[in-house]
Amino acid sequence: MTDGPGPRGLDPRTPVLVGVGTASDDAEACELMVAATEAALADAGGRGLAGAVDRVAVPQGSWAYPDPARLVADRIGAPGATSYFVEVGIPQQSLVNDALAAILSGASEVAVVVGGESKRWARDRERSGRSAVETAQPGVVPDVVRARSEPPIEPVEVAHRLWDPVQQYAMIDNAVRAADGRTVGEHRAELSDLWARFSQVSVGNPEAAFGRAVEATWLATPSPDNRPLAFPYNKWHSTQWTVNQAAAVVLCSVGVAGRLGIPSDRWVFPRVGLESSQSVSVLRRARIASWPAMEVLGETAAAWLGRPLVDVEVAELYSCFPAAVRVQQRALGLDPAGTPTVTGGMAFAGGPFNNFVLQSLAAVVRVLRAHPDRLGLVTTVSGLLTKPGLGVWSARPDGRPPLLADLAYEAASVTDTIEAVATLEGYDGGGTVATYTVTYDGMEPARVVAVCDTDDGRRCVSLSDDRALAAAACTEEFIGTRVAIGSGSFAPA
């Protein structure tokens, strides 16, 4: 159907977000996704919106559904909608951008992006001896599958179980400390103070899974309730993904919104939707403490908006670990002393696997509706500070279509890389510690995992099970130390 001029004199093809919904019931993930979508449709209002949905996209989760978008579409009364399954490793901003582009081009009228997790539901059933059986979809395949292009880490990292995000982000945060010239004690206090401020925000979030205010000193101190995971991180520095949480957004054009009678006070406009599909592992990054790809996105967004991102009034930065927030603050030119969250972040609001961006967007949209003169920033982190994304939203249009782009080429042009040694045993010789973390045996430091710059100009992963060295690396700066590397292990030179 062709729509006439849009309300407010806008091009009728202008995309707009009209509904957000969340769910946190004790139910399997597909039920949460259906509930969140139904809530988003009800939030939008209007006539016949559910039946007009022609596109449903879901980011892959930890569940086993082959086509969850089809389950959602059928349940809301949109059996003809095209189902999209988007693999882990593609920024969640990309799902939103794709839907916006389809609406702008006329390929879609009403799109839903929805995702969710129910790890707590499964855990509680297993603990009580009940089965956690998911809805089966025998013989069902999605209409469209978006597959990631390449993994975010090197084979040598996978082979030696260095895929654990807490270890990789801990190494990034330690690199930030060295780049900033902080002491180990100053650094731990700084990142714990940031997380304490996030926790204070979570108290005001009725949907926070672990909403409570905690002190920075408690966060910084390992204890049985806050056990050490990977130096400098303890449990409550980490995202908490054992939650039951789902979120959905409904997008359409202003022409469709007007035709269906969706009240304009529900409308929130995308100003910017940017991502980079470039993938470079932590091991191969010349500058581990920075994120040039996100810098490119931030500069591009600021130029389009005509104002620096530090002036955007509402922000929710992806917050799986303190390093993610700290590096993004620097990359986007935000106040390093700020508290860029309205939810309380992934440690306290909850971090449903591969879906926090949709939870963030729902929360930011609610703030923007209440404060229509403000702009809202939502960022995406895919992988290990691998593929960035960001969206800027406003309850007021600016008369232009949103800026939508994948800036992979631009990101690659400013990202310096280093060749990685292919195997743990693939280098013998001298080197310098570029970054590191320490893993634990219970409460005791047990192993140092180091990324080293080799004397022949490459990068390698090397390990030490010297417990005295591990303990020392938790109290003294270890980055910059000269080491002798051989057979996959190292010792101070």
Place the predicted regions along the sequence by residue.
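A conserved active-site cap/scaffold subdomain adjacent to cofactor or substrate pockets
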Residues: 349-357, 373
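Soluble or luminal CAZymes and related metallo-dependent hydrolases
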Residues: 32, 91, 356, 360
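Oxidoreductase and adenylate-handling cofactor-binding alpha/beta cores
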Residues: 363-370
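Conserved phosphate-binding catalytic cores of ATP/NTP-utilizing and phosphoryl-transfer enzymes
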Residues: 93-101
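Active-site capping/gating regions of soluble enzymes
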Residues: 376-378
